Design a protein with these regions (language model features):
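Positively charged n-region of N-terminal signal peptides that target proteins for export
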Residues: 1-4
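Second-shell loop/turn segments in exported
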Residues: 133-137, 145-154
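Glycine-rich, aromatic-lined ligand/substrate-binding cores of catalytic
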Residues: 242-392, 396-397
Length: 519
């Protein structure tokens, strides 16, 4: 009993110091999960892509306006914009080249990874790194700049994929392996890209269309398998196999499989881990996919059609109630009292978002208490998006970025429209480099962190509020007229955002009152 009580005390301290990206325990990318859904897999014909931007990508958000450009104009290409403090902050930003400008660029939502344009083209992202020998740091394009140009120039997903691939090939790709889930109001694609070697300008890439009736997941492991050249639902660069052979990533004899050739250590030789398996099994339990399988399919048909609420719930997931649940062994003994017998229960202090140090402390006290699992929702998330694209509505109203700040397992979502033109001032600054009380990230982060002090009880206060705000936002969006003007869209975004922020201020005060005498 003493050991159980002591673990409870440590858990109490654990609740306040939750995990950060720096505490991530494995030599693998810690950033991002994306779920993509075809139009025939949804309840109303929407196409979805999504993105949990896990890490310290900037939390400021702006809407970049459409523009016309003179013949012969060039556009600069940047590095260093993803972690600056505000729009226009040039600290650490470099111009590394330029490419010819087009006559007209579309308006787009400028998130850490640009995410939605006025034509209902949307992008989610996850990092899979791949073999470091392929990375050419001196090349021109990082992935966020590919996203920017695709959204500025393209009115459909296929063209966006082709543009990004061609830019990487022509000017060089500088990042590690990335997957972009590129969607429009009719279809969604997986686009996976890497460099082609140290000191070599170019890129290796492949893209596969998600079947209209299916769902696909990217979570830091490449997911594209066999190359299907000539298939209209598949695209790739010409050099895929030759680069793999040059760097001994494929022997040239067996069947070439993209994810096997370009996987990193995080995949452990497979094309999935916890997140992919959990999401597929949540959406298609009838398939009975095994966690011990050598690989999972690229996409699955869900047993039940998917909607926004479905995706919001999955992005909140920490595997609660499953064998992957990290809180299942956090026990606390409650002494017999008032005729009730002694009980051993999951501690009310147990939460799934601990630091490595706290996890190690608990496992030193009682070995085997916590087996680390990379959850879908993490507290080191900067922001997350669920982007809904609707072909039957005008683009301005049909495209919606449902944005949440901080931990998607705790925070509410509010809509930003493809036709929006302005955002509240709380979006102007990033909350990572310093504490900015009035920036959007911290308006939600404060209550979220306090809630983890006693998560098993605090979530019963917080989660009903998340669902209440979800209902309010969905009802407000459904009441919009198809011809709603930008001012009306902006006003709705501002109202729903402010209401959510106000409710999180009340929660912050509630949790201080509840826990203020000590953690």
């Amino acid at each position: 009993m003493k050991r159980a009580l002591f673990i409870g005390v440590v858990c109490l301290l654990a609740g306040f110091r939750t995990a950060s990206a720096q505490d991530f325990p494995e030599s693998c990318p810690d950033e991002c999960t994306s779920i993509a859904v075809g139009r025939l897999a949804t309840t109303d014909g929407s196409v979805f892509t999504s993105h949990t931007c896990d890490g310290v990508s900037h939390s400021w958000v702006s809407i970049e306006k459409a523009a016309d450009h003179p013949r012969g104009a060039m556009t600069p290409i940047y590095k260093g914009t993803r972690k600056n403090f505000f729009r226009g902050d040039t600290t650490g930003v470099k111009i590394v080249g330029e490419v010819p400008q087009v006559a007209h660029t579309y308006a787009y939502l400028n998130t850490g990874y640009p995410s939605l344009n006025e034509k209902q083209v949307a992008i989610g992202e996850t990092t899979f790194s791949g073999p470091d020998t392929l990375r050419n740091y001196g090349s021109m394009f990082v992935v966020e700049e590919l996203c920017r140009l695709a959204l500025e120039r393209c009115d459909n997903a296929r063209d966006a994929v082709i543009l990004m691939g061609s830019l990487g090939e022509k000017y060089g790709y500088a990042d590690g392996g990335e997957c972009l889930t590129v969607a429009d109001k009719n279809e969604v694609w997986f686009f996976e890209i890497l460099g082609c070697g140290r000191g070599k300008k170019g890129a290796v890439w492949a893209a596969q269309r998600v079947p209209d009736g299916e769902v696909a997941v990217s979570a830091n492991i490449p997911r594209i398998g066999r190359l299907r050249r000539g298939d209209p639902d598949f695209l790739c660069s010409d050099n895929v196999e030759s680069v793999a052979r040059t760097y001994n990533l494929w022997d040239g004899e067996g069947e070439f499989i993209f994810w096997k050739a370009f996987n990193a250590a995080y995949g452990n030789g497979r094309n999935f881990r916890e997140r992919e398996w959990f999401i597929f099994n949540t959406l298609a339990p009838s398939l009975q996919l095994s966690f011990d399988a050598p690989e999972l399919p690229f996409s699955v048909k869900p047993d039940t059609l998917v909607d926004l609420r479905t995706l919001n719930a999955i992005l909140r997931s920490t595997y609660e109630g499953t064998f992957l649940d990290m809180t299942q062994n956090w026990k606390m003994t409650v002494p017999a009292k008032n005729g009730k017998p002694e009980q051993t229960l999951v501690s009310p202090l147990a939460n799934p978002w601990l630091t490595t140090d706290m996890r190690n402390t608990l496992n030193t006290i009682a070995p085997g208490t916590i087996e680390f699992r990379r959850t879908v929702a993490v507290c080191w998330c900067s922001y997350s998006t669920v982007i809904q694209l609707r072909s039957w509505l005008p683009d301005a109203v049909g495209g919606i970025c449902w944005l949440a700040y901080d931990n998607p397992g705790q925070s509410p979502r509010f809509p930003i429209f493809a036709g929006g033109t302005s955002l509240p001032s709380a979006f102007d600054f990033c909350g990572h480099k310093k504490y900015v009380p009035d920036c959007a990230l911290w308006l939600f982060r404060r209550a979220n962190r306090l809630a983890t002090v006693a998560w098993q009880t605090d979530k019963k206060i917080m989660m009903p509020k998340v669902l209440e705000l979800e209902d309010e936002a969905l009802n407000a969006v459904s009441a919009l007229e198809p011809d709603a003007q930008p001012a009306e869209l902006d006003a709705l975004t501002a109202r729903l955002f402010q209401h959510a922020a106000d409710e999180w201020k009340v929660l912050e005060e509630t949790f201080w009152a509840k826990h203020g005498r000590g953690f």
